[in-house]
Amino acid sequence: MQSKGTIISIQFLLRFLLLWVLIGKSHTEEDIIITTKNGKVRGMNLPVLDGTVTAFLGIPYAQPPLGRLRFKKPQFLTKWSDIWNATKYANSCYQNADQSFPGFPGSEMWNPNTDLSEDCLYLNVWIPTPKPKNATVMIWIYGGGFQTGTSSLPVYDGKFLARVERVIVVSMNYRVGALGFLALPGNPEVPGNMGLFDQQLALQWVQKNIAAFGGNPKSVTLFGESAGAGSVSLHLLSPRSQPLFTRAILQSGSSNAPWAVMSLDEAKNRTLTLAKFIGCSKENDTEIIKCLRNKDPQEILLNELLVVPSDTLLSVNFGPVVDGDFLTDMPDTLLQLGQFKKTQILVGVNKDEGTAFLVYGAPGFSKDNDSIITRKEFQEGLKIYFPGVSEFGREAILFYYVDLLDDQRAEKYREALDDVLGDYNIICPALEFTTKFSELGNNAFFYYFEHRSSQLPWPEWMGVMHGYEIEFVFGLPLERRVNYTRAEEILSRSIMNYWANFAKYGNPNGTQNNSTRWPAFRSTDQKYLTLNAESPKVYTKLRAQQCRFWTLFFPKVLEMTGNIDEAEREWRAGFYRWNNYMMDWKNQFNDYTSKKESCAGL
């Protein structure tokens, strides 16, 4: 039989436990419902590893760009009175899905996984628990060539990064393709760069609201991959964006890459071409815009694919443009003038940046075989990827990447075309961008990612592909059910720590003394760190010879031989005319001679 004292103790304990549950419940609800400048939002707690992360998915940050707002800059939101239920991802922005390899995980993983809609301007926030105070914020911008992409892909899930590094992770949707980048420069109804202005408005939202989530608006790092990295570097160049963030991470992309920004004339020509295809050729811009706004978005999607010739690969149909507003000049010019945000940057590339593009139409390439191509197929590939380059220019590439090496291996042409595309489009522009930054005394860090994921569904010959460092940045190998190796989990934790340290302190080494310290990148020695499942190593001057070819030699070849094809055509036409004249003269002379001989016999 229990004593009276024991009963009292049990009652006290039960009351204490009840009070603890109630307080805990109240505290949890307080953390899950946050008051933003536009109204309250409700998130949800997610179990992550041995703890919890609170996720807010699908928070609106702009008015839906529908009807008369199509093609315009994003508009500020009005307030709402109810609690916004931010517990599932929102719509993805309209885009053409990749249908090249139906059902294949390697391509399907990048396709949108939520409904497509023009009502797509939403963002996501992951915060560690308990809710932090003044935590560093990392804002992710997805890639996709400015034509595709969505923040809801599993590979962009911010929960592991938030949990392990106790940072706040934010991602946003932005408009892509013609709906995001159609441009009639100078016309406020279709200014161009709408997708970039979407991103910029999301950055403003973070500045106004992130403190309510426990974040520090004065410690905000942008990070992105491919066109997302191109976007990040454009924010570094844009005076309007510069006050909205602190640091920047560029993964396999930069704004000075040949695909990143197009000229005003090219942007307008593509707009008028799309208008023609879609039946909106009108007498003036006002009528064109009115017609385009009345078209079904699916019709716009189908026709925007036709704007660039189908035999041209690695092209951006609609992308960033120098509008005099978001972007005041071409990135190369702004870099030369030093007109960019003075801050710290972390930049890097993957070992085999080119292979991801080869299986989408390069002659002789396939994901289903070893793609051992011939010299002729290599030359045909150069024609496709360098459509405006003279034959002399293409021969210079062939000589430098193949003939000069005297490589006798069967795979030499395959590997050479991978290197050509990777160096020209990704690696050398990224190195040039980093060099220009560091020359003005800004701290820069460069990495070379060389680990091929054990879960990669693409064939072995494609190597360490474009885009496949992202899963390690976001901590996917920490999910035990996915069967990554232990070494890959360690690599992922290391990369997350480097990224978070950089975001917090401007230095990936953080405040700890690691066994291998990541040195700053200087224009003189160009030190960089390898990231792999073994041990990181420091080297200097990544692909320096190849990048000198692209930055110094190749432009001179184009300058000297750019008109040779045209000159040759003119010469051939002239020769043909001369040859015809000569044949005509010869016929007339023969006729004259025969008549003369006839006359002589009379």
Swiss-Prot record:
Pfam families: AChE_tetra, COesterase
Annotated glycan sites: 85, 134, 269, 284, 369, 483, 509, 513-514
Active-site feature positions: 226, 353, 466
Subcellular location as annotated: Secreted
GO-annotated cellular components: extracellular space; plasma membrane
Keywords: Disulfide bond, Glycoprotein, Hydrolase, Phosphoprotein, Secreted, Serine esterase, Signal
Class of enzymatic activity (EC top level): hydrolase
Post-translational modification Phosphoserine, affected residues: 226
Its job: Esterase with broad substrate specificity. Contributes to the inactivation of the neurotransmitter acetylcholine. Can degrade neurotoxic organophosphate esters.
Self-association state and partner proteins as the record states: Homotetramer; disulfide-linked. Dimer of dimers.
Listed name of the protein: Cholinesterase
UniProt organism field: Felis catus
Gene name of the record: BCHE
